[in-house]
Structure formats: structure tokens, C-alpha cells
Amino acid sequence: VVEELNTIEAGHFTFIRPGTRFSAARGVDWDMGPTDQQSLIDDIYHSALVICSFSTMSIDAAILDKPIINLDFDGGPAHRMYERTHYRHILETGGVRKVESEKELLDAIMRSLAHPEEDEAGRVRIRQEQVWKLDGRSGQRAGEVLLSYL
């Protein structure tokens, strides 16, 4: 598996930890400012595919129509996150490939690079079901709803 992975040119993998952390605990007390948000958008836009665990990052990748691979190797407590209602809906779209081994990961990477269009219909479903509109006016709509209560 590693030998096959080595055939992919060096320098095409990036591990990003955006934002400012206010705690040593993973996933707790952190914030992303505008610069980090733009960097994340740029990183996804210029990526051939996105590999992450159960995360709204899958929705971000679907918005930019990038193949999505979710890691589920450990079978421990993190595995149960894939069973939660909100994420199960994302998996059911067919727009995300969930892999449970190193071999499945390599196969999914190679297949996604060779045929990025394969899960496109599922990514469209993710956008339709999880995002609704991609017109840049969500803040305006939220503000209008809030103003309607005044």
C-alpha cells in the first residue's frame, strides 16, 4: 500500500490545522478568523480530493464539488460518530466514501483521482440537502428572519 502511495508525487499532501486554539483539548475552544476561512476555501478549491473524518468539512468539499473520503480506521468511540443522525444523512447521499482500512483508503484515493465524477450525484445531494442555497445571501436571510421578530 505504501509503495503505491509513494507513486503519487511528493508535495501533493497537506495537513492543515487552521484557526486559533484556546485549549489543548482537541475540538474544544478554537476559532477561525477570516484569513483562516479564506485559506481553507482556497485549499479545498485547489485540492483534487478531501480526506477527513466525520466533519462538516465534507459539506465544504461537496460545495466545491471535490471527491470526499472519510476515515474510519479505529473502530473505537470515534466510529460511533458516523452513526449520529446528522452525519448519517450525509453518508446516505452517496457523496462520501467512508474507508475502514489503509487499503480501502488507497483504493479510494486512486479511484477518486482517476474518476472524480463518480460520486458527483451524491455531492449534489449533499449541497441540496445540507446547504440549500449557495447564493452568498444566507447572512441576509438570517438577518431578515431576526428582523421579522422585532
Label each residue range with its predicted role.
Residues 41-44, 96, 143:
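Generic hydrophobic alpha-helical scaffold/packing signal
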Residues 56-133:
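Catalytic binding pocket for nucleotide-activated donors in carbohydrate/polymer assembly enzymes
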Residues 135-150:
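C-terminal alpha-helical cap of glycosyltransferases
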Residues 42, 103-107, 141:
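An acidic, carboxylate-rich microenvironment
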Residues 35, 39, 101, 134, ...:
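Soluble or luminal CAZymes and related metallo-dependent hydrolases
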Residues 4-59, 124:
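Donor nucleotide-activated moiety binding/catalytic core segment of transferases
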Residues 1-9, 82-87:
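Short, aromatic/basic amphipathic alpha-helical patches
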